[in-house]
């Protein structure tokens, strides 16, 4: 089931959850959605429970004990509806409370949730809707149709808008289940009864539409047909949906018991799921009603289903308790539709709409086909609809760009982009390609519109394209595309630095912390290091570059802090930290090598500068670390030469893995060159470890160059086990042989499958080993038997030859014998050798080898010995046969009686020696084709013919009788003359005849058959042979047919006559039929083939058979001989062709004769069609009295149909009689209208009560100006909304406006008055009686189609009425716009104020402000008070300012200032300045900070009033412009303000300048006050100098005394701190000396390459590196950070 188009699974098994099978049924189980299943169950102890199962959590079953008649769960929420008697309740399960209840007046028969908010209730007579919100009772929606009375309701559905409803019921009739559906329109309030079993609604977007239509799907199974029907009940904004229908297949074996029970629609896939009672699932395409898939999903009856939203499928429950889920399989549905259904159009449509895989090739092919055919619009549509980027890519765009433009037509590329924009959003590539030409043409508004509608995918590249044209637009694109760098760049270019900061905070952009860090490094180095670590490691960071921190610390010689910082931030091993890792290791190698070694040993860092660190390691004596870091071969050789013996061998083997193969080989050669014996084991170990990298060939060459075969053997011993290289295996064999490891040579030759056999063979020959077994093994394995035999024979090693054939491989004895024969070995030796092998030698090969050399007789003793032993091998007997044939030793007897030789082999051997013996051998072995060939070559045709007759092989006959056989004629002669006449076997004769037939030899077959049938005696009366003879003559020699018919009597004429007809032997066929009394067939030949109706008439007269007359009548009918054919049919009493006769009579207008014929037919059969035609014939011949008598008598005629025919043929009087007879008042009305009887027509129309009839009479009365009667008709028409527009058009086209208005006004009193009537009357008032329009709108507004009336008012420029409609239709934007544009007629201030807050388009606020400022300026503040909460104050103030009315709106500005908007604040401040209201200005500044403070200060500092200049100084101080603030205060002699500004600045320069000013002004009090206020930042030396120079020390003493007191306190604190630190340092040094004295290293007991303690290398320092002698310390990696200070002290610091 992996390739099915559906996913099918069992969701739950209710019986496994403890639900009894008696509780699983339609009356006890409900499922309104996939979420809940609700069950009423009765326990064994008669307790009633309601069980609620949440399918998402089926293990948590909610079981409530309650007695209820029915229960149903809300599809979405945990709300339970209960029915107890006629009381309904809604209960919230979560809140455990009753939400609402009601009492039904009638018993409830069915209920269902049609939405999460509405519960539908069905009683015996009506349908109600009950909403779960509020306290309302159920509301009646419609009455049940009479057709649904006494039926069982099984379903109730609604569309998404609840404008269409459908009620589904079933009942029993004639032993089958009949379905009945009531479709109800809420808008039209009408019902329709339809036959059907299941129905549903769906929203569907018709191609070419943007708004969906509502489709209604219905499935039914009647006694005659089973169908599914899809039709449109509510139209969208596109073309009409064409009704679709499809047959539904039900397996014949299930009978009439199955029928549809439910239908669900997946609007995503546009698929209808239909489920039948017996468990069949049908999937139909919604748009075409075509069947997609059908299968059985349940063997039990399914009784309830629901739509499964999670999978867009269907969920169902069967009687067994299985909860089943069926949905579309996204992966398989499209391949299934393509491959199984072969519906490529549906596959493409579904794939495009749902982005499903499987149709890529179809789409591409379709696109290419359209494109190549020049159908670019269709190609563009295919590309636009295609999913993903299959076609929506750059290549497609380039294809459309390459199309040359066509004059006066839009380009193909433009059409393509237009379709893409209609489809939705463009992708990145499409957006770029579309924007480029738009920008080139300067059409920025279009681009802005697309961005507003989200039609383009924003990207950085798109922003780059837009940026040269519009930076603001590019900024918007960058922002949407998250191109932060470009956003920051644009902000910087425009000087919007505040926005940069805000953007950085929002998107975690890094500010510059370097300045702060520099200041901290000078004051608190350790604190700076900690802070730097936090900046780098902080979440969301790093906020600062670590390299810059290192440079900063290093420049200040903060070594310890740098090391601590680096070790703290380097948590992971990242490539970007390479410089930092290098710096960390460099510091420690220079000052603490042990720590560096520990760090490198932890392998925490790998990205540092390895060359730099390697050199430092070598200088520090860490040779192993140096080797790990060096990559240059010269460096490596240097270290190995100086300290190779001090490095561990295991490390060296491992280390060699880091070298490239060339360097590795160079080092190994150095080892072997300097001391091969000492270094051999090391080199072998290295070679084995890195054999694959160096390649075995290179290593072998290296060992061979030093002639170290022992080393080569040791190396290959390790490698050969896993190697598949032929060279490796050969070299191993060679090395083993050279060091005399012969057993290993033998083992490898036997076990290895990889060495080169020829090369190994040649080596072993040349080596001349003491034992030839390895050579024998190689030659035997690789079939070098001839070489082996030559080598052994020429070297006199015969014992190895005998041992080989006798013990090692006797099977190869033939090859050995052949080789020895070629060497002219003695025959006695060969016979003895062969006999010693006996039957172990294969006979066929031995015979072949000997026979090739013409020495076959050599084997005769051996062959006869084998036969004597009972050997039955064909090769042995073949050889004996050949020997006997050559020696002529009674060969024919041997060939006839020996059963074991191969006939083909021996026959072939005899062909040139004795052809007859070859024939004997071939015949014995049934070698057909060989026998044919040898007899053809040797003209043995008689033997061949007898063999063929006896053989009876059709294939063989076909072979010899083919045209390619040049001996065919000779063979046929022998068969006809000798072989077949000799045969008395009927089977042989039959096989031979059949062979001639199959070979298509008709003349030869006739010759053969005449020989057998006409001349022979035994087969003369054979019926089959007579038939065959005549048949062959028909096909081969037509002239003989008549003679054969006369001479032969035992043939089958009924079978041969049709064949004769096929061969156009019509007279012969007629003669055959006539000879054997087949009269019907005979006349048929005369009519059909000979074409003589006259001969046929004479023949019929002679025969006088009814069947013959029937045939004749049919022929006459076809010949349009109407009178004659009617006569013939009457004689034949044949009514079968009455329809054709009627049609012919109508064509010839022979109704008089037709009446006779139909009267004859009516006597024989009572067919409604015959009686109907008889009535019409009466009407045509104007026999109305006979017609009326006939229709009043019992009859089964279709009087309605006949009446319609009479009406169509203008026989109105006859039609009137017929319609009156059947009371068809609708058609009767039409007749009366044609006859001009209008009053009678109105009376008949009233009885018909049909809209169509009323329309017909109305139109006739209007044309006849019978307005009273027309109004009677119109009253019955206008109540139908669909007909109203046409009726209005009829009146208006004829200019009867008053009559039309009178008609509609009279119709408003009707109970059936609808929206359309009120609407159309309003439109008529608008057109013709404007004075009545407003009154009509106010009285009947709620019953109007407002958009339609709005359109009429617009067309007729009725602005007050239009404004009224806009407001009541909630189109407040249009209402405001109308009042603004047409203020003289439509504006009303109160109405305007009430409406303006409700508008959606914000631009209207500002249009309203402009409107009021221009036309109603005194009411502007009243308007602004309403708009204030909603408008952009900045924009509003800018607008008012531009119009010059700022003072007019001061009340608005004051009331809105709490919003703290810059433009608003600045405008109000401007007004305060103009009004010289400094108090209000100061209050405004303090309360609101959002305005241009500097600009205002600059403006105020020149103001003539002091208080405004003081405010300017205050503003400078608030903006940290201390110097300007102080200077302004000094000018106005506001010394207190100046001193306070200087104090707030904390700037010593400003303070000193102010002191100097007071000294210059000799204002000593102000000088002292300034010292007191600015004490914390003034420098004492400057203060003392200034006071001393101006002789005012007394005024400075308070400052000096306070400063001395503070300074001495700080010095005392520093002295105490220094003493404490000194004491602590001494204690640490003492402890350090104690630890150093406890350990003395033993330098005499060192391991190979490593010190005995701690594993550190104990080597002298490198040349040129002066290392200070310090006691060696025990290293503890866990205390590394704590030990930094100690190591710094040991190495003397930095």
Swiss-Prot record:
Topological relation to the membrane, as annotated: Peripheral membrane protein
Region feature (WD40-like repeat 1): 23-67
GO CC term, one of those recorded: clathrin coat of trans-Golgi network vesicle
Coiled-coil regions listed in the entry: 1610-1640
Loss of function: phenotype: Cells display lacks of coated pits, lacks of coated vesicles and large translucent vesicles that serve as endosomes and contractile vacuoles, and displays impaired macropinocytosis and osmoregulation defects. Phagocytosis is normal in loss-of-function mutant. Mutants lacking chcA show defects in the regulation of pseudopod formation, uropod stability, cell polarity and chemotaxis, and stream and aggregate more slowly than wild-type cells in response to starvation.
One Pfam family from the record: Clathrin_H_link
Region ranges (WD40-like repeat 6): 257-300
Annotated segments matching region Binding site for the uncoating ATPase, involved in lattice disassembly: 448-464
Chain residue ranges for the region called Heavy chain arm: 523-1694
Gene Ontology terms for molecular function: clathrin light chain binding; structural molecule activity
Region Trimerization, annotated ranges: 1551-1694
Region of interest (WD40-like repeat 2), residue spans: 68-107
Superkingdom in the source lineage: Eukaryota
CHCR repeat windows: 537-681, 687-829, 834-973, 980-1125, 1129-1270, 1275-1421, 1424-1567
Region (WD40-like repeat 3) residue spans: 108-149
Subcellular location: Cytoplasmic vesicle membrane; Membrane, Coated pit
Gene Ontology biological process terms, A to Z: actomyosin contractile ring assembly; aggregation involved in sorocarp development; clathrin coat assembly; clathrin-dependent endocytosis; intracellular protein transport; lysosomal transport; mitotic cytokinesis; pinocytosis
Region described as Globular terminal domain: spans on this chain: 1-478
Involved in binding clathrin light chain: annotated segments: 1214-1523
Domain notes: The C-terminal third of the heavy chains forms the hub of the triskelion. This region contains the trimerization domain and the light-chain binding domain involved in the assembly of the clathrin lattice. The N-terminal seven-bladed beta-propeller is formed by WD40-like repeats, and projects inward from the polyhedral outer clathrin coat. It constitutes a major protein-protein interaction node.
Binding partners and assembly: Clathrin coats are formed from molecules containing 3 heavy chains and 3 light chains.
Role this protein plays: Clathrin is the major protein of the polyhedral coat of coated pits and vesicles.
Family: Belongs to the clathrin heavy chain family.
Protein's name according to its UniProt entry: Clathrin heavy chain
């Amino acid at each position: 089931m992996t390739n099915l188009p559906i996913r099918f699974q069992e969701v739950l098994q209710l019986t496994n959850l403890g639900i009894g099978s008696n509780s699983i049924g339609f009356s006890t189980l409900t499922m309104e959605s996939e979420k809940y299943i609700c069950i009423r169950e009765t326990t064994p102890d008669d307790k009633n429970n309601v069980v609620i199962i949440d399918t998402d959590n089926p293990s948590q079953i909610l079981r409530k004990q309650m007695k209820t008649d029915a229960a149903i769960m809300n599809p979405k929420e945990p709300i339970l509806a209960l029915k107890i008697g006629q009381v309904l309740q809604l209960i919230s399960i979560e809140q455990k409370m009753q939400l609402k209840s009601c009492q039904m007046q009638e018993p409830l028969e069915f209920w269902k949730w049609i939405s999460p908010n509405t519960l539908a209730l069905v009683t015996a007579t009506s349908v109600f809707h009950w909403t779960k919100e509020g306290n309302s009772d159920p509301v009646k929606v419609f009455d049940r149709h009479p057709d649904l009375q006494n039926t069982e309701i099984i379903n109730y559905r609604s569309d998404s808008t609840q404008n269409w409803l459908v009620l589904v019921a079933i009942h029993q009739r004639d032993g089958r289940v009949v379905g009945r559906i009531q479709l109800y329109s809420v808008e039209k309030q009408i019902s329709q009864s339809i036959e059907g079993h299941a129905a549903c609604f769906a929203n569907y977007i018709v191609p070419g539409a943007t708004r969906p239509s509502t489709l209604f799907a219905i499935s039914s199974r009647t006694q005659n047909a089973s169908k599914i029907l899809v039709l449109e009940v509510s139209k969208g904004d596109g073309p009409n949906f064409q009704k679709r229908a499809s047959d539904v297949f039900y397996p014949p074996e299930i009978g009439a018991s199955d029928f549809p029970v439910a239908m669900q629609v997946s609007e995503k896939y546009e698929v209808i799921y239909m489920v039948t009672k017996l468990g069949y699932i049908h999937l139909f395409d919604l748009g075409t009603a075509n069947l997609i898939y059908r299968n059985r999903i349940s063997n039990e009856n399914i009784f309830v289903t629901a739509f499964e939203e999670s999978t867009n499928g269907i969920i169902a429950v069967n009687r067994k308790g299985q909860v089943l889920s069926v949905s579309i399989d996204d992966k398989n549905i499209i391949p299934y539709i393509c491959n199984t259904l072969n519906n490529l159009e549906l596959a493409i449509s579904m794939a495009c709409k749902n982005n499903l895989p499987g149709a890529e090739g179809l789409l591409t092919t379709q696109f290419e086909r359209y494109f190549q055919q020049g159908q670019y619009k269709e190609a563009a549509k295919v590309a636009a609809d295609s999913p993903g980027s299959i076609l929506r890519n750059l290549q497609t765009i380039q294809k459309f760009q390459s199309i040359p433009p066509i004059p006066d037509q839009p380009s193909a590329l433009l059409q393509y982009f237009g379709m893409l924009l209609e489809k939705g959003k463009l992708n990145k590539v499409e957006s770029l390609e579309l924007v480029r030409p738009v920008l080139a043409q300067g059409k920025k508004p279009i681009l802005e519109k697309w961005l507003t509608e989200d039609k383009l995918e924003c990207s950085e590249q798109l922003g780059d394209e837009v940026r040269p044209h519009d930076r603001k637009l590019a900024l918007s694109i960058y922002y949407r595309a998250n191109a932060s760098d470009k956003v920051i760049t644009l902000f910087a270019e425009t000087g919007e630095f505040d926005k940069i900061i805000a953007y950085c905070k929002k998107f975690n952009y890094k500010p510059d912390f370097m300045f702060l860090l520099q200041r901290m490094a000078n004051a608190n180095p350790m604190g700076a290091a900690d802070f730097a670590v936090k900046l780098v490691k902080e979440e969301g960071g790093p906020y600062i570059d670590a390299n810059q921190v290192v440079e900063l610390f290093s420049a200040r010689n903060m070594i310890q802090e740098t090391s601590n910082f680096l070790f703290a931030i380097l948590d992971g091993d990242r490539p970007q930290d390479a410089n930092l890792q290098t710096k960390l290791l460099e510091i420690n190698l220079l000052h603490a090598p042990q720590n560096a070694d520990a760090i490198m040993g932890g392998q925490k860092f790998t990205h540092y500068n390895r060359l730099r660190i390697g050199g430092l390691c070598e200088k520090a004596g860490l040779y192993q670390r140096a080797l790990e870091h060096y990559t240059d071969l010269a460096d490596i050789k240097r270290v190995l030469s100086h300290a190779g013996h001090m490095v561990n061998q295991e490390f060296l083997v491992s280390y060699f893995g880091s070298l490239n193969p060339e360097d590795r080989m160079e080092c190994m050669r150095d080892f072997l060159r300097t001391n091969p014996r000492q270094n051999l084991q090391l080199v072998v170990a290295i070679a084995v470890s890195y054999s694959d990298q160096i390649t075995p060939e290179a290593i072998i060459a290296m060992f061979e160059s030093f002639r170290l075969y022992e080393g080569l053997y040791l190396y290959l011993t390790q490698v050969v086990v896993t190697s598949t290289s032929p060279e490796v295996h050969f070299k191993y064999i060679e090395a083993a042989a050279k060091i005399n490891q012969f057993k290993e040579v033998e083992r490898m030759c036997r076990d290895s499958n990889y060495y080169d056999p020829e090369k190994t063979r040649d080596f072993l020959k040349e080596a001349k080993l003491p034992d030839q077994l390895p050579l024998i093994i190689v030659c035997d394995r690789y079939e070098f038997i001839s070489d082996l035999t030559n080598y052994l024979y020429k070297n006199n090693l015969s014992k190895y030859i005998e041992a080989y054939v006798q013990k090692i491989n006797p099977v190869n004895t033939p090859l050995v014998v052949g080789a020895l024969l070629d060497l002219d070995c003695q025959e006695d030796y060969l016979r003895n050798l062969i006999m010693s092998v006996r039957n172990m030698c294969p006979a066929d090969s031995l015979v072949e080898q000997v026979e090739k050399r013409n020495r076959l007789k050599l084997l005769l003793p051996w062959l006869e010995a084998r036969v004597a032993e009972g050997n039955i091998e064909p090769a042995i007997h073949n050889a004996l046969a050949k020997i006997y044939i050559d020696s002529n030793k009674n060969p024919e007897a041997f060939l006839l009686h020996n059963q074991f030789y191969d006939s083909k082999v021996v026959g072939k051997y005899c062909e040139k020696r004795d052809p007859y013996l070859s024939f004997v051998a071939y015949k014995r072995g049934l070698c057909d084709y060989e026998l044919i060939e040898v007899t053809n070559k040797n003209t043995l045709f008689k033997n061949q013919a007898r063999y063929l007759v006896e053989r009876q092989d059709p294939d063989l006959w076909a072979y010899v009788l083919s045209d390619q056989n040049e001996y065919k004629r000779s063979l046929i002669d022998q068969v006809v003359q000798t072989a077949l006449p000799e045969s008395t076997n009927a089977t042989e004769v039959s096989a031979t005849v059949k062979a001639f037939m199959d070979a298509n030899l008709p003349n030869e077959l006739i010759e053969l058959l005449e020989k057998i049938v006409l001349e022979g005696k035994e087969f003369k009366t054979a019926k089959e042979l007579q038939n065959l003879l005549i048949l062959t003559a028909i096909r081969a020699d037509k002239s003989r047919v008549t003679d054969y018919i006369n001479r032969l009597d035992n043939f089958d004429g009924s079978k041969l006559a049709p064949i004769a007809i096929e061969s156009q032997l019509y007279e012969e066929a007629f003669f055959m039929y006539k000879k054997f009394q087949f009269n019907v067939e005979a006349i048929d030949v005369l009519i059909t083939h000979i074409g003589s109706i006259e001969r046929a008439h004479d023949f019929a007269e002679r025969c006088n058979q009814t069947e013959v007359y029937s045939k004749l009548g049919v022929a006459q009918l076809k010949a349009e001989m109407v009178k004659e054919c009617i006569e013939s049919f009457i004689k034949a009493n044949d009514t079968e062709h009455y329809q054709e006769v009627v049609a012919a009579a109508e064509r010839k207008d022979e109704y008089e004769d037709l009446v006779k014929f139909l009267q004859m037919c009516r006597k024989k059969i009572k067919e409604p069609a015959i009686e109907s035609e008889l009535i019409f014939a009466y009407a045509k011949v104007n026999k109305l009295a006979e017609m009326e008598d006939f229709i009043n008598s019992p009859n089964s005629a279709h009087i309605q149909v006949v009446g319609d025919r009479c009406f169509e043929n203008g026989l109105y009087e006859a039609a009137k009689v017929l319609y009156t007879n059947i009371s068809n008042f609708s058609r009767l009305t039409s007749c009366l209208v044609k006859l001009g009887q209008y009053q009678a027509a109105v009376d008949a129309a009233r009885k018909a009560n049909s809209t169509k009839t009323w329309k017909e009479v109305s139109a006739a009365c209007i044309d006849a100006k019978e307005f009273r009667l027309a109004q009677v008709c119109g009253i019955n028409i206008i109540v139908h909304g669909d007909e109203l527009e046409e009726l209005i058009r009829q009146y208006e086209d004829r200019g009867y406006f008053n009559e039309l208005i009178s008609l509609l006004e009279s119709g408003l009193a009707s109970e059936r008055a609808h929206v359309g009537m009120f609407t159309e009357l309003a439109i008529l008032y608008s057109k013709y009686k404007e004075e009545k329009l407003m009154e009509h709108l106010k009285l009947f507004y709620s019953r109007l189609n407002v958009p339609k009336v709005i359109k009429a008012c617009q067309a007729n420029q009725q602005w007050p009425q239009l404004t009224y409609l806009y407001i009541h239709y909630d189109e407040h934007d249009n209402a405001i716009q109308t009042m603004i544009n047409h203020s003289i007629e439509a504006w009303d201030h109160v109405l305007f104020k009430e409406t303006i807050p409700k508008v959606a388009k914000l631009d209207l606020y500002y249009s309203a402000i402009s409107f009021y400022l221009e036309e109603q300026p005194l009411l502007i503040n009243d308007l602004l008070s309403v708009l204030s909460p909603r408008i952009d104050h900045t924009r509003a103030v800018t607008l008012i300012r531009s119009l010059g009315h700022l003072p007019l709106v001061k009340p608005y500005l004051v009331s809105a200032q709490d919003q703290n908007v810059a433009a608003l604040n600045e405008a109000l401040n401007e007004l305060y300045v103009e009004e010289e209201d400094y108090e209000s200005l100061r209050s405004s500044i303090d309360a609101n900070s959002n305005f241009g403070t500097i600009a205002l200060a600059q403006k105020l500092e020149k103001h003539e009033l002091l208080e405004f200049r003081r405010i300017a100084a205050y503003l400078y101080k608030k903006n940290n412009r201390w110097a300007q603030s102080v200077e302004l205060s000094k000018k106005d002699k506001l010394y207190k303000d100046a001193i306070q500004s200087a104090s707030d600045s904390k700037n010593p320069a400003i303070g000193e300048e102010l002191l100097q000013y007071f000294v210059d002004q000799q204002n000593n009090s102000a000088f002292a006050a300034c010292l007191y206020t600015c004490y914390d930042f003034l420098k004492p030396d400057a203060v003392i100098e200034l006071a001393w120079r101006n002789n005012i020390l007394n005024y400075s003493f308070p400052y000096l005394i306070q400063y001395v007191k503070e300074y001495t306190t700080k010095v005392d604190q520093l002295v105490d701190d220094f003493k404490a630190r000194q004491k602590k340092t001494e204690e640490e040094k003492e402890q350090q000396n104690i630890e150093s004295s406890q350990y003395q290293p033993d330098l005499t007991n060192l391991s190979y390459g490593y010190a005995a303690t701690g594993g550190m290398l104990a080597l002298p320092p490198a040349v040129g590196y002066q290392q200070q002698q310090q006691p060696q310390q025990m290293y503890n990696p866990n205390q590394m950070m704590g030990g930094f200070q100690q190591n710094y002290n040991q190495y003397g610091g930095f």
